[in-house]
Amino acid sequence: MPTIFSLFLIISCNRKEKQSTFLFEHGGIEREYILYVPDNIQPKAPLIFVLHGLGSTSSYIREYSQMDEVAKKYGFVVCYPQGTESGQNSIHTKKGSSFWNVGYDIHINEYVNDVSFLKSLARYLQEKYNLDPRKTFCSGMSNGGDMSYLLGCEAADVFKAIASVTGCMMAWIYESCVNNAIPVLQIHGTKDDITHYNGDMKNKDKWGAYLGVETTIDFWIDQNKCLGSMIDTIGFTHKSDSSYIISKKYINGINKNEIWFYKVINGGHDWVQKPVIKDFNTSEEIWRFFENFISLNNLDT
């Protein structure tokens, strides 16, 4: 049984919403997470996890994503879990850098089971705060996006849809993920110099082989048996900015599942927000994607 310890409660002078950091004991390890619960949250509200990138923190992705503001506006709970610290130096990271265990080559000697941890934490929060298990989702950036894909394959019983921002699908996850239909959102820049848009199946960067973005999307389209598609373009912010987004939505899949893909032309390794792209906010789009799942399945009644 997981044990919960309250570390500290941060409440700003002009806001009533609960903003807390806790410890959650799992597998003999005390794991940290930040929880944002808007004031007057309704029973059976949605729960969204937001996972940080490699070497980052839960507090950083919270500030960077500004998901609290979206949660306050639309009425859902946000959990920002903290990854564990690596036990040794590597060609990419220093000892002690935080990570989600998706099987990178640099983590070959790391054995933490983050799938089990995140599933257990989600179930605890569902019960503790009376949140709807049918409306529990996961999103993440970079390594957190990679982890979201792993959850999509191994934890779809808990996380009903996933969103990956600048993340990838490791080759080993792709090879082991069979007959699993789950809604997926991917947001990725074509000039991402960290998680390459075209992947790295030859493992030149020594992370471990991973698929290109479009191959990954094709995989999930096939998994969900989507029968239709829609394409749109989200325009420039200003004339000197060459970035824009091609939006592709694949619809009418198994259980009404949809695959949304935002291809950020000339985009980098970013959680895209205004003013980079006019009228586009990644956190808002993630919620819109999850809300679409809720609506299609009549879960908001």
Locations of regions flagged by a protein language model:
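A domain-start/cap signature at the N-terminus of enzymes
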Residues: I10-L47, S59-Y74, E110-S116, P133-V165, ...
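Structural cue for short, hydrophobic secondary-structure segments
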Residues: V50-G53, Y80, K263
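Active-site glycine-rich loops that stabilize anionic/oxyanionic intermediates
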Residues: G53-T57, G267
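A fold-wide structural signal in alpha/beta-hydrolase
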Residues: G75-C79
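Cap/lid segment of the alpha/beta-hydrolase catalytic domain
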Residues: G83-N113
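Alpha/beta-hydrolase active-site loop
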Residues: I106-Y129
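Short beta-strand/loop motif that positions the catalytic acidic residue
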Residues: Q186-H188
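Acidic catalytic loop of the alpha/beta-hydrolase fold
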Residues: D192-T195, H269-W271
